[in-house]
Design a protein with these regions (language model features):
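Acidic/His- and Gly-rich active-site-bordering loop/insert found
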Residues: 2-99
Length: 100
């Protein structure tokens, strides 16, 4: 398996973990912990404030411009028409399905 394939598999596993973890708005402490643990495992310095996780590039150079990547990790309550288990990441035909 190439390094790119390894990283792709790790990204899929992280996404599956996030999908499998309920994270309704204001209740995303478990997904915040999952993200922080993943970053720390990969040697990325990070801080957590409430459910927000802040990470700094380990190759940070103060003489260069900064780039902010921002995302949310909360979800809305699944509606009654949802046809799958919303908290079970499923891969079918090369596609990943789940709430999020």
């Amino acid at each position: 398996m190439s390094r790119i394939e390894e990283l792709q598999q790790e990204a899929i596993e992280l996404l599956q973990g996030l999908i499998n973890t309920p994270s309704l708005s204001s209740e995303e402490d478990q997904t915040a912990a999952l993200i922080k643990k993943w970053l720390e495992k990969h040697g990325v310095s990070c801080k957590q404030q409430r459910n927000n996780v802040y990470a700094i590039n380990k190759h940070e150079d103060p003489s260069k411009p900064y780039l902010l990547l921002n995302s949310h990790h909360d979800t809305v309550l699944p509606n009654s028409g949802y046809s799958r288990d919303p908290y079970k990441a499923a891969i079918e035909d090369g596609k990943l399905y789940g709430l999020g």
